[in-house]
Amino acid sequence: MFGIGKKKAYAEHMAPQWMKILTDCRDLVNKTADPDVFFPRYELLKETAANLASISKYVKFRGTKPAEVLKMAQEQEEAATRDFILRSFQRALLGAEKAKTAKGKRSQFDRFLEKLEPYYCQMSAGNAKLVQQLHADAIKRIGG
């Protein structure tokens, strides 16, 4: 009995904090174009959803249940990563438009590729190929 009471108190204490983390992560992964933000925050989102799911028998949640949020995060990870890649490429395109020289334009697209390469292991083969294809097409367009 004592163990359950402690678990419930812990769950009630942690739930609001984990909900805030979950909300912050959701907002960041849906808006950022920085891979150093996107990938760690997506992992934190899944971890936090799992934590919330583990305490759901002690705390009532309104709206979507934490286990469902975790399932959606796992199922939609590839699509979310693709959306992120396209946002990141858009940022590179904007930078290239502002650049005055072909070298400056190319450096925007090279930076796009270089920043994403370390994260290939965290994305599907299709998304890694998308990054490479976007880079190759952009370099072709500027005559590189």
Feature locations, PLM:
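Short Lys/Arg-rich cationic patches that frequently serve as NLS/NoLS or arginine-rich RNA/DNA-binding motifs
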Residues: 1-9, 100-107
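Short terminal alpha-helical segments
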Residues: 4-50, 89
